[in-house]
Amino acid sequence: MSRNKHVARKLRMAKANRQNRRVPAWVMVKTNYRVRSHPKMRHWRRTKLKV
């Protein structure tokens, strides 16, 4: 399955992978740790992508 993907699907999955990052440390320091996570974090097992 890893090789046999459409290019468009692979690009969408790569975009989702880039978006699934934690909040930078400097943001947490700047907001005095009020912002620890962002609501679009996605766990690979809990929430599946619709791609």
Curated annotation (Swiss-Prot):
InterPro entries: Ribosomal_eL39 (IPR000077), Ribosomal_eL39_CS (IPR020083), Ribosomal_eL39_dom_sf (IPR023626)
Gene3D superfamilies from the UniProt entry: Ribosomal protein L39e
GO biological process: translation
Keywords in alphabetical order: Ribonucleoprotein, Ribosomal protein
UniProt entry tagged with the keyword Transmembrane: no
Top-rank taxon, per record: Archaea
One GO cellular component term: ribosome
GO molecular function, one term: structural constituent of ribosome
Pfam families referenced in this protein's UniProt entry, alphabetically: Ribosomal_L39 (PF00832)
Family (UniProt): Belongs to the eukaryotic ribosomal protein eL39 family.
Name used for this protein in its record: Large ribosomal subunit protein eL39
Source species of the chain: Methanothermobacter thermautotrophicus (strain ATCC 29096 / DSM 1053 / JCM 10044 / NBRC 100330 / Delta H)
Gene: rpl39e
